[in-house]
Amino acid sequence: MASTLNDKRWNGALALVTVLAACTKEPATPSRACLQFSSDLMPLFAGGMIRKDFRVSNAWAVKSDSSIDSAGVKLPAYFLSADIIAPNGEAVVGTWLTTAVTQPGLVYSVSPQAKKYSTWAQTGAADKSTAGFTTASPGAKESITCVLNNRPKTSTTSIPAKP
């Protein structure tokens, strides 16, 4: 009986050590939340498209870890990705940087597609505080993934941008 009791105590101590070790591990990096871009802002956002027969839809944002310093005021930064849809229905994902997702804010083109199809200023060109924001910045690829994961199943798409 004594050996069984000792075995149980040993197993209990081992379990306690395992639990404590698990509690001291670094927490996993939280996943970046997909924030739906306000549908009320879509007409204003679409106004920046070069071709008026192109439209934007399925817009999602992910908050950046960095902020934009605009005239000494720190503003939040969000990577905004959306489908740019040609008149034939073909879609490609573009990525921009914005300071707001529920009200009008500053907008900058980040991805090659955004630069090609919209008139929004490029990051770093007009505002030096946006120079460090690229498609490789944390949050940019995640915002593209939000768009790809939330596309309607019936849309015609081209080769998606790499997340």
Residue ranges and their predicted role:
Residues A2-G12:
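Bacterial N-terminal signal peptides that target proteins for export
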Residues V17, P27-A28, A140:
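Processing junctions and N-termini across compartments
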Residues A21-A22:
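C-terminal motif of bacterial Sec signal peptides marking the signal peptidase cleavage site
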Residues P27-I85:
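N-terminal secretory signal peptides
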Residues F79-P163:
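Extracytosolic low-complexity repeat regions of secreted or lipid-anchored proteins
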